[in-house]
Regions:
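Residue cluster at the C-terminal edge of the helix-turn-helix DNA-binding motif
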Residues: 60-65
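Residues within the DNA-recognition helix of helix-turn-helix
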Residues: 54
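Central "turn" residue of the DNA-binding helix-turn-helix
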Residues: 45-47
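Short, Lys/Arg-enriched N-terminal segment that forms or immediately precedes the first helix
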Residues: 2-16
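Short helix-boundary/capping micro-motifs
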Residues: 34-41
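Basic, amphipathic "hinge/linker" alpha-helix immediately C-terminal to the N-terminal HTH DNA-binding motif
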Residues: 69-92
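Alpha-helical linker/hinge and terminal dimerization helices associated
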Residues: 88-107
């Protein structure tokens, strides 16, 4: 038998609806980095329309917005990830790391 490896895909649901997964976390992190939905979408080779719909879907499921937009003004507009958004990123990454560690431990136990 060849080398065995475990893999997993984690997602978080809220009220039975898809809320957060790897791609959405990457989008939130890109928005946080660029301060722009358009730049974040381009960096992920995603359309602006899809990025905005994804944000709207997450915001509508969250208890408070994960992303907020500001318009115009002397400094120009922009987009930012809120504390709730950053907390959601941290939750996903923590749970994903724990799942990965669990699977690695199980694999080690299986191979010993």
């Amino acid at each position: 038998m060849g080398e065995i490896a475990f893999g997993n895909k984690l997602w978080i649901e809220k009220n039975g609806q898809f809320f957060l997964g790897k791609g959405r976390v990457e989008l939130l992190k890109a928005i946080d980095s660029f301060g722009s939905i358009n730049a974040a979408a381009k960096s992920m080779q995603m359309s602006y329309k899809k990025a905005w719909k994804t944000i709207d879907d997450m915001n509508s499921l969250a208890n408070e917005p994960l992303v907020i937009r500001t318009t115009g003004g002397s400094g120009g507009g922009g987009t930012s990830v809120t504390k709730a958004g950053k907390d959601a990123i941290s939750l996903y990454e923590r749970v994903n790391a724990n799942c990965h560690s669990f699977l690695e431990d199980e694999l080690k136990n299986e191979q010993s």
